[in-house]
């Protein structure tokens, strides 16, 4: 991934790679968050500055693995979209929006923009989401961004309540996916 990547979301919003220097923005963005961290092994609720730096170091796009794009309005971080490589030809996408910014369509626009960029810019044919079955807003984001339900996996998603996976709790996840249109076989549908 190019660290200088910027994707325009319209209405003054843009996506760009989050880097170590964005730790303060991440702390500010999560200051009112009571839910678990954005994703991965970070503490519940707000990030401290050391937690934010550790998370951003893990999401370094130069490392070639997982990375995160921030949704920004000027210099205010409104949310983030993470892309985590999976098996060859696929990647998981995760997203988070500040509570005060939810319900404005920001997540749908950001997910759609990163999905299209991942298909075209990174040549990843399949992008998938893991969604808690009770997370209705996230399910609406998936639908609005053009994702399709694939399956329900029992006890597949980790809660990250503890650092040790053996002692953590796990919950069911709904898998939604988006396949790059040029890789889908055309289906002839009779005219009705």
Task: Please give the residue ranges for each predicted region.
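Acyl-donor (CoA/ACP) binding surface of acyl/acetyltransferases
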Residues: 1-35, 68-192
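Short gly/ser-rich anion-binding loops that grip negatively charged ligand groups
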Residues: 42, 46, 65, 72
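Short loop/turn motifs at secondary-structure junctions and domain boundaries
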Residues: 59-64
């Amino acid at each position: 991934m190019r660290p200088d990547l910027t994707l325009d979301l319209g209405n003054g919003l843009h996506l760009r790679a989050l880097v170590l220097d964005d730790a303060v923005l991440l702390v500010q963005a999560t200051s009112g968050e009571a839910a678990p961290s954005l994703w991965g092994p970070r503490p519940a609720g707000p990030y401290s500055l050391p937690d934010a730096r550790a998370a951003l170091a893990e999401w370094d796009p130069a490392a070639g693995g997982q990375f995160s794009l921030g949704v920004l309005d000027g210099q205010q971080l409104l949310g983030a979209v993470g892309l985590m490589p999976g098996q060859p030809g696929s990647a998981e996408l995760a997203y988070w929006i500040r509570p005060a910014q939810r319900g404005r369509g920001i997540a749908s626009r950001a997910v759609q923009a990163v999905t299209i960029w991942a298909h075209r810019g990174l040549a990843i044919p399949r992008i998938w989401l893991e969604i808690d079955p009770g997370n209705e807003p996230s399910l609406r984001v998936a639908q609005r961004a053009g994702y399709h339900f694939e399956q329900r996996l029992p006890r597949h998603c980790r809660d990250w309540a503890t650092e040790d996976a053996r002692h953590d709790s796990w919950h069911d996840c709904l898998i939604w996916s988006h396949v790059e249109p040029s890789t889908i076989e055309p289906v002839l549908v009779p005219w009705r």
